[in-house]
Curated annotation (Swiss-Prot):
Function comment: Responsible for synthesis of pseudouridine from uracil-13 in transfer RNAs.
Top-tier EC class: isomerase
Superkingdom assignment: Bacteria
EC number: 5.4.99.27
CDD domains, per database record: PseudoU_synth
Annotated GO MF terms: RNA binding; tRNA pseudouridine(13) synthase activity
Name assigned to this protein: tRNA pseudouridine synthase D
BP-aspect Gene Ontology terms: tRNA pseudouridine synthesis
Family, similarity comment: Belongs to the pseudouridine synthase TruD family.
PROSITE patterns in the record: TRUD, UPF0024
Residues at the active site: 76
SUPFAM superfamilies found in the cross-reference section: Pseudouridine synthase
Domain TRUD: 151-361
Length: 398
């Protein structure tokens, strides 16, 4: 079974994100500011700055509370990103006059409400792939044609799993209450890091030299240092040590684990991810509603026209369950982890209710242009979908 939807099309190879200008992300807003209200909607262009860091700099420059700023989606630090931020009770003229390193204010206008997470249609991507193989443009066009017709596999992919690619393993250990395993994975694998001091700190921990590991970990590794501090105090207190992790980080680990199981289910369903079956939970692309497929004759044409798509599980204690073959697949995947849906019913603000996620998403406005030995790609995806899913199918460099 291939990991690629477009397995019959040769990959282009190449390199992405060689410079910030090689990767442009631009939000497609769900609505435009009305021009009236108490929230200033500012469109920022950020160069090599993540969303949360931009919020910090913006709040400091304007003398407002960071928590009062609103945003529709999270953007990472790699590349150039254009996104809207809402700021309460600040005039557009004041925002437009700001001079913040790495941030340019492109426009500003007032609106009646604070911008909330999810208040966007999607994102447009303009990406340069450098040093591609011969015939790359034709192969990229062929891969994009398949994805335009059948959909883009809605994977999370490796960027979901942290710098060492193992945050989902921490989440799995949490759910099984295997706290030593969770701590071991959080401290990390020396083979997965390139920084010398970081590697030495991990190696010291693995030798059982916890105090030395603590001394070696740089100060900005706050989570790791707090874990190790507690282990120095009580060497066998792994649950106590792990409880020092903030709930926000614990939810991130649990979410990464959910994502890894979704990706696993998608991989097993890839050959038919654009077709619905009786027992599937289908997703309506128009409004995000989900329903159980019972009448295949009625629903199959809707999947063919991309009105609906089958879904996969973001496992949780109240998640809507599939029936039939898809339901059996999902139960097998969860049973292999020695977990049930009730396992996600955690206390302490960590309860994971779960949801359904479409196995595919539509791609819009896809264009390819050859520029010497580079490819220029331009396409749009709905919110919550990742450009890396498209790039993986085109480049096949995984």
């Amino acid at each position: 079974m291939s990991i690629y939807l477009t397995a019959e099309v040769p990959g282009t190879g190449g390199v992405i994100k060689a410079t910030p200008e090689d990767f442009l992300v631009e939000e497609i807003p769900a609505y435009l500011p009305s021009g009236q209200g108490e929230h200033c909607f500012a469109v920022l262009e950020k160069r090599g700055i993540a969303t949360l860091e931009a919020l910090r700099r913006l709040a400091k420059a304007l003398g407002v509370q960071e928590r009062d700023l609103g945003y529709a989606g999270m953007k990472d630090a790699i590349g150039i990103t254009r996104q809207t931020i809402s700021i309460p009770r600040v005039a557009p003229e004041k925002v437009l006059a700001l001079e913040i390193p790495g941030i340019t204010v492109l426009s500003a206008s007032m609106h009646g409400n604070k911008l909330r997470l999810g208040h966007l249609k999607g994102n447009r991507f303009v990406i340069r792939v450098r040093d591609v193989a011969q015939g790359a443009a034709g192969n990229a066009e062929a891969a994009l044609e398949i994805m335009t017709r059948r959909g883009v596999p809605n994977r999370f992919g490796v960027q979901r799993y942290g710098a060492q690619g193992n945050t989902h393993e921490i989440g799995a250990a949490m759910l099984r209450r295997e706290f030593k395993s969770a701590v071991d994975r959080l401290i990390g694998d020396p083979a997965a890091v390139t920084d010398e001091r970081w590697r030495l700190a991990i190696e010291a921990y693995r030798r059982g030299e916890v105090a030395e590991s603590l001394a070696l970990f740089p100060g900005h590794f706050r989570v790791e240092r707090e874990l190790l501090t507690r282990l120095v105090q009580r060497p066998d207190g792994f649950e106590r040590a792990f409880n020092s992790v903030q709930p926000r980080m614990k939810r991130l680990y649990l979410s990464a684990f959910q994502s890894s199981l979704f990706d696993l289910v998608l991989g097993k369903r890839l050959d038919s991810f654009d077709q619905v079956n009786v027992g599937d939970i289908a997703f309506k692309h128009e409004n995000g509603a989900c329903f159980l497929v019972q009448d295949l004759a009625a629903e199959a044409p809707r999947a063919e026209s991309f009105e609906i798509s089958p879904t996969g599980p973001m496992f949780g204690c109240t998640m809507m369950e599939s029936h039939g073959a898809q339901g059996e697949l999902e139960r097998e995947v969860l049973a292999a982890q020695e977990l049930t849906l009730e396992s996600f019913n955690l206390s302490g603000g960590l309860r994971m209710e779960g949801e359904r996620r479409p196995l595919r998403v539509p791609i819009a406005g896809a264009e390819v242009r050859q520029d010497g030995s580079d490819l220029l790609l331009d396409f749009s995806l709905p919110r919550g979908a990742y450009a890396t899913c498209v790039l993986s199918e085109i480049m096949k460099s995984d």
